C-alpha cells in the first residue's frame, strides 16, 4: 500500500520537493528547482494548487479517472480532493510552475466566498485548462511577480 500525503500546508509540499517556503500561506513553485522527486504519490489536498505544466512529466489520476492534460495547460486541485501522480521521466527536475495557497489566505475575501463556484476545481472536470501562448506568458508573468513580492517579506504597517 502506498502512503497518502496529506497536504495541509504549502510548507509540507515544499519540503517534499526540497523547495524553499517564503510564506506559510502561499508559495510559487518551480519544479525545475526541485531537489527531490517522487515516482508515485497519492495526494490528499488541504490546500489549493494550480500547476502550469510546461511538459507532460507524469500521469495524473484525479478522483476515479485520468486527468486529461498536456504541455502548456493548467491543472487545478482544491482542498478535500485526492490525486495520484506517477512520474513518466527519470529526471528530478520537471518543467512545471505553480502556485499553492492555503484556504486561510482567502478568509474574509470575495474570492473566498465564491471559489467553490469555479468548475476547474471540480472532480467532474477532469480536463486541464488549455491556454494560448499569450495566456501562458501572462500566467508566468503573474507567478514571477507574486514570487518577487514573496521574496520581499511581510510589509510592516
Model-found features: residue ranges?
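Histidine-centered metal-chelating micro-motifs
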Residues: 75, 80-86, 106
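Basic/polar, acidic-poor N-terminal "presequence/leader" segments
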Residues: 61, 81-86, 91-92
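Short aromatic/basic micro-patch
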Residues: 44, 76, 100
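Generic protein-terminus/edge-of-domain signal
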Residues: 1-61, 65-67
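Short acidic-glycine-tyrosine-enriched beta hairpin
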Residues: 64-78
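A hydrophobic/aromatic-rich effector-binding and dimerization subdomain
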Residues: 16, 20, 88-152
Amino acid at each position: 500500500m502506498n502512503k497518502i500525503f496529506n497536504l495541509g500546508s504549502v510548507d509540507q509540499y515544499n519540503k517534499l520537493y526540497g523547495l524553499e517556503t517564503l510564506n506559510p500561506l502561499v508559495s510559487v513553485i518551480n519544479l525545475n528547482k526541485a531537489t527531490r522527486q517522487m515516482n508515485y504519490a497519492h495526494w490528499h489536498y488541504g490546500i489549493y494548487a494550480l500547476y502550469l505544466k510546461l511538459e507532460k512529466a507524469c500521469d495524473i489520476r484525479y478522483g476515479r479517472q485520468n486527468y486529461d492534460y498536456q504541455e502548456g495547460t493548467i491543472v487545478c486541485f482544491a482542498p478535500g480532493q485526492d490525486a495520484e501522480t506517477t512520474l513518466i521521466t527519470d529526471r528530478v527536475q520537471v518543467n512545471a510552475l505553480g502556485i499553492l495557497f492555503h484556504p486561510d489566505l482567502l478568509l474574509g475575501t470575495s474570492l473566498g466566498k465564491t471559489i467553490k463556484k469555479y468548475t476547474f476545481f471540480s472532480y467532474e472536470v477532469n480536463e486541464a485548462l488549455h491556454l494560448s501562448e499569450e495566456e501562458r506568458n501572462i500566467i508566468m508573468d503573474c507567478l514571477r511577480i507574486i514570487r518577487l513580492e514573496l521574496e520581499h517579506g511581510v510589509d510592516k504597517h
